[in-house]
Amino acid sequence: MKKKHTQVRVIYWIIIAIGSGALGMYMAKTQWNTAVLALWLVVIFLGAMAVEMLWFRSLGKKVAALTPLLRTDPDKYIAGIEDLLGDVRSLGVQQTRCINLAAACCEKGDYAKAVDYLTSLDPRRIPAVNQGAYWADLALAWFHLGQNEQARAVIDGNADLFTRMKDSRGLGGLAAVLSVYYAKSKGDLELAWERYYAAREAWPDPSTQKELDRLEKVLRKATEERK
């Protein structure tokens, strides 16, 4: 993907070079016009911005087109994300890459790898739009790895975010799952079961139901051990 981006940039700057040459020849034959030069510089700047914006928009659409694979074929999703984003140096793109790869690793059950991807990022530099997915997947991975204190620290440290997340169409199911894990990790099985049944009813989407299937086994085992 980076190669195509470079090609677009090269073509743009070739056009700019030709235009600059033509403008230089014109101004050499006529009276020097500062206004024309200033206008040309503005055109160059705005053109460069437009090229970047169009490329990133195209890239975003291609990433979005891979989304169905995240649930059905996470390995293919990972390959697609790496093909699109793996060689792009932009910090924002690499943040998106790591967050998306971590989500795919969670789908595969490779939670240690998900943690590796997420902890490689500086959370202070992650845009607000990605904060929910970042912290939710990190908490989920920590819970699955048995690192309950670290998982709860993630949730407690971002309490306002997780409260808002409960009503999110995209992340509400995951937030509900995490609330069950949280109660279970604190030893409150009664509350955990209560939240579990509420999540079953409120979030019928396949992804949440799949996670709740796993969680049910955990709760049943904990309940049996307590008897």
Where do the protein language model's features map onto the residues?
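Juxtamembrane interface helix immediately N-terminal to a transmembrane segment
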Residues: 1-16
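Terminal, low-structured helical/coil segments at or just beyond the last alpha-helical repeat
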Residues: 17-18, 188-227
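Helix-turn-helix repeat elements of alpha-solenoid scaffolds
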Residues: 35-40, 66-82, 106-118, 146-157
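Transmembrane alpha-helices and immediately adjacent membrane-cytoplasm interface residues
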Residues: 39-69
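Residue signature of alpha-solenoid helical repeat architecture, marking inter-repeat boundaries
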Residues: 56, 91-94, 128-131, 168-171
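"A position-specific structural signal for the A-helix of alpha-solenoid helical repeats
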Residues: 64, 96-103, 130, 136-140, ...
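Amphipathic alpha-helical segments of tetratricopeptide repeats
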Residues: 82-86, 115-124, 156-166, 197-202
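Structural motif corresponding to the intra-repeat A-B loop/turn of tetratricopeptide repeats
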Residues: 108, 145, 182-186
